[in-house]
Amino acid sequence: MDRYGNSEIVQYLYFYPDQYRFDIRNEIDWAEDHVLLRDYFPVDIHTNEATFDIQYGNVKRPTHYNTSWDFARFEVCAHKWIDVSEDNYGISVLNDCKYGYSVHDSVIGLTMLKSSSYPNPDADRGHHTFSYSFCLHEGDFRDGDIVSKAYAFNNPCKAVTKQEKNGKGNGVGSVFDFC
């Protein structure tokens, strides 16, 4: 648990022995004014562009600020994932509800919360639970099957109990449905 001003931030890390992946689940009680909460991740990947998931595909953006146009695009919208890759390996960040990213040189930035005063002075105040995941892969995001992994991360399987066909009983059956 960490504190920032009047806010409380808890991060849980999950490591998987059979995957090149780890997850970070965040629980944040946010009570700040005029603060942008970002997380930064330095990576050992050197490339001139990063790939961002957008609504009907993906888009590449530079990882440097050579022009005023590059500098103005300090943050890029991405839906489910971003990827930074060299020729034969890379890292992708998957998310379940955060959409503002930056990649500058070899540092990935993720905007977690923003407490602005306009248009809604209460925006992002209160309790938040969200997760993101880091996936290491060979090749680029296509070789790493990142699109499928991002969909699986956003739509995990959930086990639910099934009622008996006649509707009688306590409502708990012995058969599971997976959706």
Predicted regions and their residues:
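C-terminal (or distal) subdomains of carbohydrate-active enzymes
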Residues: 1-179
